[in-house]
Every structure is written in structure tokens, then in C-alpha cells.
């Protein structure tokens, strides 16, 4: 007998988010020893988190039976100290994507317009469609703020999403260009700046750094999101945050379920913020190893996007093999990269790994691109 539940009609136009392939799947499909698998498809920190973070979590294991402090005051105080903010301008979430969900449900009504880049983080579209919004996008792979501005004038969007540095392309917008753009946007449009990769962009080019406090002070219609999944190595703990004006934050809290961040996640994130030297070491490795991928691309005449994140995007066009074919070939060797076919790109997104991982990945890629 078929299911008779009257599901919402909007579900007919929705797709589930497709995450990067996990190690467990590769073990099941190809029987490869998990210790031999190189996972560079999800932009995780290949070194993991700081040892002090693991120690804090180990010591707190016995607290798993208790609900967390739902005020998350210690965590918010640590984030506030990092950004020179008051805690009433911060909301934590189960990953920054949960905070993005809060934003959409807080702001969007049926039929509202949302403006995104054509190639961008998939959850913006998914969350907006769940709210019944209409999606409008620019035509370019990388961000074109002039195109954003033209469309914004035409459709008067309720929300604009800017992902900088961008995922999955890796491009980044300069602070001056973003501020000029924001000055031309109506105050009744919320502009979300997704800064999941901001630490990487700042290290490479300080002109790409958009300070959370400054931008939200200057532009009250800006909401800034960050994560502990990338530079801090806490992807598996699922913790992120949002920063905005007090009125916006207080309304977002109305959308937040209780205890949305676990005890251990909150403790880990709070401790992670005390380890900037660890972060700096990882950033140094990222940019040193990025040069190897850029050199390889130049030698092989591979088109790529200048990246300001912890990954690089290689285009496979004119190479004889599609990105899907290359990704599958490497997958059988235990190397997980991200095929961008779901973004309508014949391209691979490659997380920058540890030096010894990159040795093997570059060797395998040379055979595929030769």
C-alpha cells in the first residue's frame, strides 16, 4: 500500500544535500583498508584538532548524560572575545548550516526572493526553498558583485547570500568591494556573509578579510556566519555560530531548538579558540602545500580557480576524461576528492592535505591528467 501522508508540495522541487563521500563508504564499496584512505573531499582539517581540545573532550566524557548549559555562555564569551563583541550578538548552532536554517525560517515568507551565486554552498538554496522562497542566481562561477547588484535592484530579494571565500569555487571578495556593494543594498534586505573559510583568505590576502564586528556595526542588515569545522578541525563536532545585531539575534533564538549544541562540542570549540598557534601552523601548511597544486596545474596546463580557502578546484575540460571519471578512478585507489558534477561543473575540488597525502594525490592526478 502506498503512503497516503499529504506531504508538502514544495518537496517535489527539493533535493537532499549530497555530502562528500565518507571513508566508511569507500571501505564498503572497494574493500580498502581505512588506514590507507586519503579523504580530501570535504574540506576538513587533515591534521584534526589541537591536542588540548582532545584532552578537554576526554576529561568531559562523563558529562554526556547531562544536557548542556543552554545559554552556552562560556562558548559565546569565547567567541565574543575573539571578535570583540558582546554575547547578545552571537548565536551558536549545530554547524553554521543550522544557523543559516534559522535565518531562512526567521526572515522568509512564501514567495519571497533569495539571491545567490550560481555556484555556491548548496544549503542556501535548500533552506530557502523549504520556506517557499523563489531562488534567483547570477550566471558566473565566481562572485560578480555587479551582477548581484543588478539583480538585487530588479527582484528586491529578502536575503542575499555571499560566500567568501566561496565554496566550492574558492574565490574571495575584497573587503572594499563588499563594503561598496553593501552600501548600495536596501536595509530591508538581509545580506548573509558566510565566512566559513575566512581564516584562510585572511592569511593569504588581508584585503580579503571582512571583520565580523566592523561589518555588522557598519551595516545592520548584515549577518555573519562562521564555523569550527574547517580551520579548527571540529567538523565531526558540528558547531558554528552567527553574528549580527541584537534584534536579529533575539529573533533567531526563537527558531533555535533547545540544547542545539552538545556539551562536548561546546567545550571543544571553547578550547579551540585558545589555540591560535595551532591554527597558524595549519594555515602555514595549507598555503605551502597549495603552491604544489598550483605548480602542478601550471605544468599540466590544468585550468584552476585561484583559491583563498583550504581547497583548490581543477577543471577537467579538454582533458579526455570527465571529472566524474577521474574522481571514480582515484576513489578505487582510496583517494576521496569532490566531483563537482552536481554543481554543473566538470571539475574536481581537492582539499589541501598533509604533505605525505598530497604526494600520493599529485602522483595519482598526474596519471589521470597526462
From Swiss-Prot:
<dbReference type="InterPro" id="IPR005861">
    <property type="entry name" value="HisP_aminotrans"/>
</dbReference>
<dbReference type="InterPro" id="IPR015422">
    <property type="entry name" value="PyrdxlP-dep_Trfase_small"/>
</dbReference>
<feature type="modified residue" description="N6-(pyridoxal phosphate)lysine">
    <location>
        <position position="230"/>
    </location>
</feature>
<protein>
    <recommendedName>
        <fullName>Histidinol-phosphate aminotransferase</fullName>
        <ecNumber>2.6.1.9</ecNumber>
    </recommendedName>
</protein>
<dbReference type="GO" id="GO:0030170">
    <property type="term" value="F:pyridoxal phosphate binding"/>
</dbReference>
<comment type="subunit">
    <text>Homodimer.</text>
</comment>
<comment type="similarity">
    <text>Belongs to the class-II pyridoxal-phosphate-dependent aminotransferase family. Histidinol-phosphate aminotransferase subfamily.</text>
</comment>
<keyword id="KW-0663">Pyridoxal phosphate</keyword>
<keyword id="KW-0032">Aminotransferase</keyword>
<keyword id="KW-0808">Transferase</keyword>
<dbReference type="GO" id="GO:0004400">
    <property type="term" value="F:histidinol-phosphate transaminase activity"/>
</dbReference>
<dbReference type="InterPro" id="IPR004839">
    <property type="entry name" value="Aminotransferase_I/II_large"/>
</dbReference>
<keyword id="KW-0028">Amino-acid biosynthesis</keyword>
<dbReference type="InterPro" id="IPR015421">
    <property type="entry name" value="PyrdxlP-dep_Trfase_major"/>
</dbReference>
<comment type="pathway">
    <text>Amino-acid biosynthesis; L-histidine biosynthesis; L-histidine from 5-phospho-alpha-D-ribose 1-diphosphate: step 7/9.</text>
</comment>
<dbReference type="GO" id="GO:0000105">
    <property type="term" value="P:L-histidine biosynthetic process"/>
</dbReference>
<dbReference type="InterPro" id="IPR015424">
    <property type="entry name" value="PyrdxlP-dep_Trfase"/>
</dbReference>
<keyword id="KW-0368">Histidine biosynthesis</keyword>
<dbReference type="Pfam" id="PF00155">
    <property type="entry name" value="Aminotran_1_2"/>
</dbReference>
Amino acid at each position: 500500500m502506498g503512503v497516503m501522508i499529504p506531504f508538502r508540495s514544495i518537496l517535489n522541487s527539493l533535493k537532499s544535500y549530497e555530502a562528500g563521500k565518507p571513508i566508511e563508504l569507500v571501505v564498503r564499496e572497494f574493500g580498502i583498508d581505512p588506514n590507507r584512505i586519503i579523504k580530501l573531499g570535504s574540506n576538513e582539517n587533515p591534521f584534526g584538532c589541537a591536542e588540548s581540545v582532545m584532552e578537554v573532550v576526554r576529561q568531559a566524557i562523563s558529562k554526556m548524560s547531562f544536557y548542556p548549559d543552554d545559554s552556552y555562555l562560556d562558548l559565546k564569551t569565547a567567541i565574543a572575545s575573539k571578535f570583540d563583541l558582546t554575547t547578545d550578538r552571537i548565536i551558536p548552532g549545530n554547524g553554521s548550516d543550522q544557523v543559516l536554517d534559522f535565518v531562512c525560517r526567521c526572515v522568509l515568507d512564501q514567495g519571497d526572493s533569495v539571491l545567490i551565486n550560481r555556484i555556491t554552498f548548496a544549503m542556501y538554496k535548500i533552506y530557502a526553498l523549504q520556506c517557499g522562497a523563489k531562488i534567483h542566481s547570477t550566471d558566473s562561477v565566481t562572485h560578480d558583485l555587479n551582477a548581484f547588484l543588478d539583480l538585487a535592484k530588479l527582484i528586491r530579494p529578502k536575503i542575499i547570500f555571499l560566500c567568501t571565500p566561496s565554496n566550492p569555487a574558492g574565490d574571495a571578495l575584497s573587503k572594499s568591494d563588499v563594503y561598496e556593494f553593501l552600501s548600495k543594498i536596501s536595509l530591508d534586505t538581509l545580506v548573509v556573509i558566510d565566512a566559513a573559510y575566512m581564516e584562510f583568505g585572511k592569511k593569504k590576502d588581508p584585503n580579503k578579510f571582512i571583520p565580523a564586528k566592523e561589518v555588522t556595526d557598519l551595516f545592520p542588515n548584515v549577518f555573519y556566519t562562521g564555523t569550527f569545522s574547517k580551520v579548527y578541525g571540529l567538523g565531526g563536532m558540528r558547531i558554528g555560530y552567527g553574528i549580527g545585531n541584537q534584534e536579529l539575534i533575539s529573533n533567531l533564538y526563537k527558531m533555535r531548538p533547545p540544547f542545539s549544541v552538545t556539551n562536548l562540542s561546546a567545550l571543544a570549540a571553547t578550547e579551540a579558540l585558545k589555540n591560535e598557534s595551532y591554527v597558524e601552523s595549519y594555515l602555514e601548511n595549507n598555503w605551502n602545500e597549495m603552491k604544489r597544486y598550483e605548480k602542478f596545474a601550471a605544468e599540466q596546463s590544468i585550468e584552476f580557480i585561484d583559491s583563498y580557502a583550504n581547497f583548490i578546484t581543477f577543471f577537467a575540460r579538454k582533458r579526455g576524461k570527465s571529472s566524474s571519471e577521474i574522481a571514480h578512478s582515484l576513489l578505487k585507489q582510496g583517494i576521496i576528492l569532490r566531483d563537482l558534477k552536481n554543481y554543473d561543473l566538470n571539475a574536481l575540488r581537492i582539499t589541501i592535505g598533509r604533505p605525505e597525502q598530497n604526494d600520493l594525490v599529485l602522483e595519482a592526478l598526474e596519471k589521470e591528467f597526462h
